[in-house]
Structures are given as C-alpha cells and as structure tokens.
C-alpha cells in the first residue's frame, strides 16, 4: 500500500500543538490595513485553535504530523 501524501498547502497553514490540537493564523491582516485600528490588528496577530468540526479534516490532510 502506498504512503499517504501530505497536503502541502495545509502543512503551511496549520501547526500541531503539544496536546494534539491545531492552531492557525487569523484572516483580515493582508491588505486594506489603514482603516483598521491598531488594537484590532494586534488582536489578529495572535494564533487561534481550529474548530472541533475541522480537526478531522485537517488530520486527513496531515497524516504524519
């Protein structure tokens, strides 16, 4: 049986934590930043955990993490 390939786009977007959960970067921080206030942009810099519904999909994408 062949090896399962890792989905490279998912490998770049998600990191696995010590507890087995996955963290991701937040959206809305790429462009049109002048009208967003500093507090909002600072809040968006933090990483967040992915939802419970998406964990199973991400595990399929990243079989060797």
UniProtKB/Swiss-Prot annotation:
Q: Which residues cross the membrane?
A: none
* GO cellular component terms attached to this protein's record: cytosolic large ribosomal subunit
Short name of any one Pfam family annotated for the protein: Ribosomal_L35p
Q: Which InterPro entries match?
A: Ribosomal_bL35, Ribosomal_bL35-like, Ribosomal_bL35_CS, Ribosomal_bL35_sf
Annotated region Disordered: the residues are 1-26
- State the source organism's domain of life: Bacteria
In which family does this protein belong, per the annotation?
Belongs to the bacterial ribosomal protein bL35 family.
| Stored NCBIfam families | rpmI_bact
* Name this polypeptide is given: Large ribosomal subunit protein bL35
GO MF, one term, reads: structural constituent of ribosome
Q: Gene for this protein?
A: rpmI
Species source reads: Buchnera aphidicola subsp. Baizongia pistaciae (strain Bp)
Q: Which GO terms describe its biological process?
A: translation
Keywords for this protein:
Ribonucleoprotein, Ribosomal protein
């Amino acid at each position: 049986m062949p090896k399962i390939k890792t989905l490279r786009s998912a490998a770049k977007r998600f990191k696995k934590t010590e507890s087995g959960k996955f963290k991701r970067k937040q959206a809305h921080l790429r462009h049109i930043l002048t009208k967003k206030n500093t507090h909002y942009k600072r809040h968006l810099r933090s990483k967040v955990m992915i939802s419970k519904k998406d964990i199973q999909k991400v595990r399929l994408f990243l079989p060797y993490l």
